[in-house]
Amino acid sequence: MPKRDAPWRSMAGTSKVSRNANYSPRSGIGPRINKAAEWVNRPMYRKPRIYRTLRTPDVPRGCEGPCKVQSFEQRHDILHTGKVMCISDVTRGNGITHRVGKRFCVKSVYILGKIWMDENIKLKNHTNSVMFWLVRDRRPYGTPMDFGQVFNMFDNEPSTATVKNDLRDRYQVMHRFYGKVTGGQYASNEHAIVRRFWKVNNHVVYNHQEAGKYENHTENALLLYMACTHASNPVYATLKIRIYFYDSILN
């Protein structure tokens, strides 16, 4: 015997809502709104006062827009003895990739690329780890110091590298990471993807020269040190390094 229709079905302008369209997770259609999502995405006026007073500004303090960008694209031959490159080289000018005056702030650093081995090396059974150090040089002078001049190592092993005691005030390691490649006929991994994004807020100061060189820095140069653990087998890094910076209002 069929069930009797509910009295509201006969009312004008009403219809039965299908259970398949109730936005349940099993149906797979439509957004599913719950109290947790509403609380996370609540408007700013419903958040505590500390969220409103201590918000991180898009533009660093003491700087002005627009956000500018400088890219460094290069293939590096990474050695066991280490390598260094300056990533705060910005030429003075009026473009979106230039600095207006002597001072600017590097808000963030984006490193992407890959570590790889050539055809001859990847057939050998070995593991090679490549380490990167993002270092701030507070008092740059002359040319960048080599890896062995800045870092103290045990048995000349880069994996044990720490900044020398007498240079800890000048060189500050802001971030470090590593990538690993493996060679051999079986289970080899001949390349590794590199992708890092850091917020640094590093205030760089140049002298009166216009060229973007390390020798023209006077304060807070950004250096990227690289070294590999294997002494005989070389490894390469194809990197694109982008810095996002703002000009200082003191220029």
Curated annotation (Swiss-Prot):
Query: Can you tell me where the transmembrane regions are?
Result: none
For this protein, the record's Pfam families field holds: Gemini_coat (PF00844)
Q: Give the UniProt keywords, A-Z.
A: Capsid protein, DNA-binding, Host nucleus, Host-virus interaction, Metal-binding, T=1 icosahedral capsid protein, Viral penetration into host nucleus, Virion, Virus entry into host cell, Zinc, Zinc-finger
Where would I find the unnamed zinc fingers in this protein?
63-80
* Keyword check for Metal-binding: yes
Q: Where is this motif: Bipartite nuclear localization signal?
A: 3-20, 195-242
User: Motif span (Nuclear export signal)?
Assistant: 96-117
Its principal location?
virion
Its annotated compartments are:
Virion; Host nucleus
Stretch list, region Disordered: 1-29
Cited InterPro entries: Gem_coat_AR1, GV_A/BR1_coat, Viral_coat
GO CC list: host cell; host cell nucleus; T=1 icosahedral viral capsid
Q: How is this protein organized at the quaternary level?
A: Homomultimer. Binds to single-stranded and double-stranded viral DNA. Interacts (via nuclear localization signals) with host importin alpha-1a.
Q: Of which family is this protein a member? A: Belongs to the geminiviridae capsid protein family.
* Protein's name according to its UniProt entry: Capsid protein
